[in-house]
Amino acid sequence: MLLEGKNALITGAARGIGAAMAEVFAREGANVWAFARTPDARFEARLAMAAGKYGVWIKPVYCELTDTAALKEAFRQVMADKQPLNVLVNNAGIMGEDRMFQMTSAEDMHRIMDVNFFAMVEVSRLATRLMARNKCGAVVNIASVAGIEGDSRLDYSASKAAVIAATKKMARELISVGIRVNALAPGFTDTDLVSGLSEKVTQEQLGRILMHRKARPEEIAGVAAFLASDMASYVTGQVWRVDGGML
């Protein structure tokens, strides 16, 4: 198992790629703190089922990531478990409305950046302080091909480009305390974020992909598990595209 004996913190774990991350990481032997925004009985039942199936513990932790006080309280819950934090996956994110550049307001930008970038930075600051105590760790930031290509909404693309830039800076700085930092850039993935797209836009996107289909969330999660594992011990500061051959 890729992650046997490791403890991972995954944000945005209630649905989509984050839910797949919790399942795949548990399958690969990791214990998981599964961060989500609001309490949900079905979410907790799913975590309990996965924990029993794979013989690990998975604990739900609820907080609004953009609320600094709530986030610090969530990390106090993590620290109360007295288990080392080995892996952080910054997965939480939102996409926002589909607007043209000229129609995107500063308010739109702030709302997306607060969740997709600033919260990611604050989570990383808190998590890597814990990792640094053991002089080792791995961070996987979930970016997007939109942050590379700039072909999506302005606010979303800009937020993911910022995640990529931060990944490189974090990698340079944190390697001194044994922490690797990489970004994973998914392409067109079958999640709630893209379910509302029109059939026309969906077909346009699929037409750019050599594999002619959306990614499954578990396919993205599998690559994240590799980057978090010791199998990727010589990989840091990189952006891994997982896009089915998007040209």
Question: Where does each model-flagged region fall?
Answer:
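Conserved glycine-rich cofactor-binding loop
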Residues: 7, 14-15
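Active-site helix of classical SDR
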Residues: 124, 159, 167
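Alpha-helical segment proximal to the catalytic Tyr-Lys
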Residues: 129, 172-176, 233
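Residue(s) in the substrate-gating loop at a strand-loop-helix junction
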Residues: 144
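C-terminal substrate-recognition "lid" of short-chain dehydrogenase/reductases
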Residues: 2, 136, 213-242
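Substrate-binding pocket helix/loop in short-chain dehydrogenase/reductase
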Residues: 99-101, 105-110, 194, 205
